Amino acid sequence: MPTTREQILQALLARLETIPGATAKREAPLPETVPVGGLIVLRDGDPGEPEMLVSPPTYLWQHKAEIEVIVSRGAGDANTALDGLLMAVGQALEADRSLGGLADWLDWGAPKTHDLAIDGAAGLKGAVVPVTIHYASTNPLG
């Protein structure tokens, strides 16, 4: 059975996969082309150092992950497309902040936007959304 951490990351990816038109992946390299509906890449991030309760042994995590949201600058207004996709990400996360009961709480911060220049790629516009996943496990491996 996967660790609590892995189950949570899989559930978070499943939430992102519910966004209509977009393609969601986990730990994928940045592409040369982006699907028409945009690309969402979940980066596993860092679980950090947990707080520990001793009886029974419980590890309290504040796992920092990132969600990269990328659109093509080709057709239409990339800023509007990126904003729309970011809103859809927010709605998908808001719909289930406990990820089916696996996490205590899911919180995210403001996106940091940037233009992407990848060799051989059309112009891309992206944003990184920091996500903090609060959860408990009985094992220090997550």
Residue ranges and their predicted role:
Residues 1-36, 45-142:
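Charged, amphipathic alpha-helical segments and their flanking helix caps
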Residues 41-42:
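Generic preference for hydrophobic
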